[in-house]
């Protein structure tokens, strides 16, 4: 945001305690913007001076209203969501409550409190559902809701459409209209990221990263947290009158703009921590069967022990099937310029926090995980073989 007018700016960030939300808040704060972080739990990091944290549950309208009480908010960055990966993907009720009801609450309060701008953090998944997409753009239709392989993607699609349909909604007392846009980021990475990278490192350290899968030519995309911060700030500016409200009612794909094989992207992390990158490659359909089994085990045992599934079916598609998108619209309308980044920062972060291969022997837990992994893979092979035979006939 323009520092010359940042004194007048007061923004509210839902999901502000999360990795990306906190990073965005710090960047805006450095520009002199008054920042309010709204989340169900407080940030793990020290909150810088000038940033206010308000604890609350986005599912409760009264909590959302309280977050707006003491500030004349001029822009909301709606980042809060639930169910992106792992065991969270299997909690359908909570996913809907946070992603859909939470968005309804935000839109309602924005209208009441006469907030002129709302930037929604969406996902590639509103378009992608396991089909190959090469250099897709924003003209692609939404994936039909019943075709989404997971509830997170389905609810994010519903929420994005609600946000964009709310564009130009009159604010209370006839005080202007609400301008909205949606950013669809690829998978986020960066030093200190707490969702995807720690899970991957945990698998590496437990000796579970034994294979890759799918076509080695398959391509996906990622976005560094700082590029995503840049895109959100630009989007909020592009909703202004002096920018011709160019982003008003529009979606934008956001990534680093460098399609890459999913497993090759993570090779520097594996080898940088001193581990051997696996050479075994399995068929995508076999791993999909394996993921189905882990989901079934979680369904049966999850109430007794809410363990982290090794993989979900959606994660298999997202990592093993080609899907990447053009940045032309974001470049042209927002002025977005992706900066070059890699995983080296993340490698150094993990090393600084005690991760990396040591010279000691593997502990007994690794052998237990090995046994469970082999057992599930054998069952997956038995499930997969009949279907592979049928396909070959």
Curated annotation (Swiss-Prot):
The chain crosses the membrane at residues 282-302, 371-391. Pfam families: 3Beta_HSD. One of its GO terms (cellular component) is membrane. It is a multi-pass membrane protein. GO terms for biological process: steroid biosynthetic process. One of its GO terms (molecular function) is oxidoreductase activity, acting on the CH-OH group of donors, NAD or NADP as acceptor. Changing residue 154 to Q: Found in two patients with genital anomalies and features compatible with Brittle cornea syndrome; uncertain significance. Its EC number is 1.1.1.-. Keywords: Membrane, NAD, Oxidoreductase, Transmembrane, Transmembrane helix. The active site is at residue 152. NAD(+) binds at residue 156. InterPro entries: 3Beta_OHSteriod_DH/Estase, Lipid_A_modif_metabolic_enz, NAD(P)-bd_dom_sf. It is found in: Membrane. Gene3D superfamilies: NAD(P)-binding Rossmann-like Domain. It comes from the Eukaryota. CDD domains: 3b-HSD_like_1_SDR_e. It is an enzyme of class 1 (oxidoreductase). Belongs to the 3-beta-HSD family. This is Short-chain dehydrogenase/reductase family 42E member 1. It comes from Homo sapiens (Human). The lineage of its organism: Eukaryota, Metazoa, Chordata, Craniata, Vertebrata. The gene is SDR42E1.
């Amino acid at each position: 945001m323009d520092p010359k007018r940042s004194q007048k700016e007061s923004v509210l960030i839902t999901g502000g305690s999360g990795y990306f939300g906190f990073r965005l808040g710090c960047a805006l704060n450095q520009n002199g913007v008054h920042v309010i972080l709204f989340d169900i739990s407080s940030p793990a990091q020290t909150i810088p001076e000038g940033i206010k944290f308000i604890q609350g549950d986005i599912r409760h309208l009264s909590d959302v209203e309280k977050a707006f009480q003491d500030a004349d908010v001029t822009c909301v960055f709606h980042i809060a969501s639930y169910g992106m990966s792992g065991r969270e993907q299997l909690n359908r009720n909570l996913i809907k409550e946070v992603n859909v009801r939470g968005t309804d609450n935000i839109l309602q309060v924005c209208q009441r409190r006469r907030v002129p701008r709302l930037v929604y953090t969406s996902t590639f998944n509103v378009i992608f559902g396991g089909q190959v997409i090469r250099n897709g753009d924003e003209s692609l239709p939404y994936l039909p809701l019943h075709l989404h392989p997971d509830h997170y993607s389905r609810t994010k699609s519903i929420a994005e459409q609600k946000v964009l349909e709310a564009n130009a909604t009159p604010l209370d007392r006839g005080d202007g209209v609400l301008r909205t846009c949606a950013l669809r980021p690829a998978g986020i990475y960066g030093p200190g990221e707490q969702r995807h990278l720690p899970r991957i490192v945990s698998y590496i350290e437990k000796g579970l990263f034994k294979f890759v899968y799918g076509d080695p030519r398959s391509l996906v995309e990622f976005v560094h947290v700082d590029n995503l911060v840049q895109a959100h700030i630009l989007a909020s500016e592009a909703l202004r009158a002096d920018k011709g409200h160019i982003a008003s009612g529009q979606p934008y794909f956001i990534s680093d703009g460098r399609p890459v094989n999913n497993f090759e992207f993570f090779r520097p992390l594996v080898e940088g921590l001193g581990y051997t990158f696996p050479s075994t490659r399995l068929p995508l359909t076999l791993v999909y069967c394996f993921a189905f089994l882990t989901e079934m085990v979680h369904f049966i045992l999850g109430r007794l022990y809410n363990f982290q599934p090794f993989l979900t079916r959606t994660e298999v598609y997202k990592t093993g099937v080609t899907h990447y998108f053009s940045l032309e619209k974001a470049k042209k309308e927002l002025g977005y310029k992706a900066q070059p980044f890699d995983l080296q920062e993340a490698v150094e972060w993990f090393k600084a926090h005690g991760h990396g291969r040591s010279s000691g022997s593997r502990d007994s837990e690794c052998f237990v995980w090995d046994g469970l992994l082999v057992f599930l893979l054998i069952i997956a092979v038995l499930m997969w073989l009949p279907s592979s035979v049928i396909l070959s006939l």
